[in-house]
Amino acid sequence: FCRILDEAYDQGVGFLVIEPAKGEYKDVFGGLDDVHVFGTNPAFTPLLRIDPFSFPQGIHVLEHLDRLVEIFNVCWPMYAPMPAVLKDAISRSYEDCGWNLTTSENSFGEGLYPSFADVARNVREILDSSEYDAENKGAYKGSLLTRLNSLTNGLNGMMLTSDGVDDATLFDGNTIIDLSRVGSTETKSLFMGLIVLKLQEHRMAAADGMNQPLRHLTVLEEAHNLLKRTSMEQSTEGGNLLGKSVEMLSNSIAEMRTYGEGFIIADQAPGLLDMAAIRNT
């Protein structure tokens, strides 16, 4: 794929590489003057910083909220009421920050968004006031709060911040995002999903028409981390939530082509990719 990127670069087509495995692209392209490299270890690269809760002007808060919940459904094991609890907690967190979920306006002014600490607090309050029995309540709180709290401290807390890298820097130029040093597969998938979400909304907000020629190319390496093959069988916990979420994410990637965004979905084990992703190539 380096040759394809090289040719795109020569023709003035910008690129974004999301690399969760080896970190080789930064060695090939990282030395070029107009290529930005971001990673997860500030000793080697500038730190990737994104705000999962912010969205560009022109995107409705509920649009963003739904897409964000789909990312969590893909990346975290969810069962029974957990997706609904998480969505409710995120909704309340936006309202706590002054957002009107109907008008998508903030009474405190622009630029104020919730954090994972806000969401964790609301998850706890929702479950504490629920009618689930103590055993299930403890299981749901343990699963959700452990994951949410892990995103508020350490490197995750430094990267998932309100002081994010400008979207234009990430998505309009030439950028390599090296996630190869992230240890947790769940966290790696989450970062990949959040980047794709931010890219999608950036393209939608900046769109100046449909069926645009190729303007930008995104390479999604080891794509099974995000677009993993799932069983199509219904489960006793309320249906194939993961499969539906992966399919929606795959469709979002396909729909970005109308804004001039090209995608290369790469994987050494294509059998691990969901069929929805393969159909869209």
Walk through the language-model features, giving the residues of each.
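Conserved helicase ATPase motor motifs in RecA-like P-loop NTPase domains
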Residues: E255, I265-P270
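P-loop NTPase motor domains
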Residues: R3-E261, A277
